[in-house]
Amino acid sequence: MDNRNEKLTHNLIYNSISLNENENILVEVIGEDGLELANEIIKQAKIINAKPHLNIINYEDLRNFLINATKEDIIEYGKKDYEIMKKMQAYIGISAPTSDKSLNGVSQEKLELYNKYYIALVHLDQRVKHTKWCILRYPNEYFAQKSNMTLNEFKDFYYNVCNVDYNKMKIAMEPLKKLMNQTDKVHIVAPGTDLSFSIKGIPAEKYYGTFNIPDGEVATCPVKDSVNGYITYNTKTKYNDIIFEDIRFDFIYGEIIKTTAKEKTKELNEILDTDDGARYIGEFAFGLNPYVNNTMCDTLFDEKINGSFHLTPGMALEESDNGNRSAIHWDIVKILRKEFGGGEIYFDDILIMKDGKFILEELKELNAENLK
């Protein structure tokens, strides 16, 4: 066993979810590569007399189920796991896929039913709102290949980004959180992007290893009908096993009224037609992890890229709620660092970030070189 899993598990149990004696914790592994970490979590949970429960989801089994399932089958599957989740006080989810096409062959209709009757019910409505939870990936050959690294190189990267000094990050985030809570108008200008919206009255929140590992973001949400202009994202993103590039959204009064994506505009619109809320924004956040520099086409890493922000169609964050409701929550990232084209972010007409660097004195501790 990689002994770095002991430190990671300690951070998960004591920092991320603050697990207590007699609490039920569901350790869910999606893909068998994550079992080594799951076993360490179960071991340490038992030491403090918590009650761990293990659920292993095999991607191939899930794929075959969805291909053959009726709508009623998916609804029953969701109801069953919803009842299990209701009994949990804590949750750790470990994902270890082996392919970009884990759900290849599942129709868009089935994926939408799965998102609506399983993901939304079990995770968005129950797990997110009623448990202490954290989700993370597990380092394997798949992630190493996506990162253009050897497995050992990726493991070193992984444990660096996961075991960053979150206490230092937490302190450095406070001035940004305070500024966001005082801000009305946000204006973002970058190649293919001229976007404005209000965040007035929407609470900002710091994320420093509590819900995601790796972590590092400060997030809020636009006032629902305030988003106007257009944005072109400069990272690849995956949703429902489809990889999208060069996504552009055009907004009028908060609604995405026009979309394009390289060779995938039809599929993009199908996702945004999931429900009425899918065409409105549910999160605006800065990525701040000093060790995450480039996209992996994996949201859990990409949304933490330093010098980036994400603007998220779909369900609003509970902590920064603008009232938007949807079965989707899709974090799509735009990197503002100079090598990615640069860009500027203004708060109430004051420049706060240029080319991925905070320029206000009170925010400079959040720049990557100061968080390492």
Regions found by a protein language model. Give the residues of each.
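Short solvent-exposed loop/turn micro-motifs enriched in small/polar/acidic residues
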Residues: 10, 179-181, 224, 240-243, ...
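Dual-mode signal for accessory low-complexity, basic/Gly-rich regions
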Residues: 258-325
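Internal helix-turn-beta structural module
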Residues: 296-371
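Short aromatic-centered micro-motifs
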Residues: 188, 250, 345
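Short, glycine-/Ser/Thr-/acidic-enriched flexible segments
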Residues: 32-33, 97-99, 140, 202, ...
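Active-site lining segments that contact anionic ligands and/or coordinate catalytic metals
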Residues: 228, 244-246, 253, 279-283, ...
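Active-site bordering "gate/hinge" segments
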Residues: 1-228, 366-371
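Long, well-ordered mid-to-C-terminal structural blocks that present hydrophobic/aromatic surfaces
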Residues: 225-270
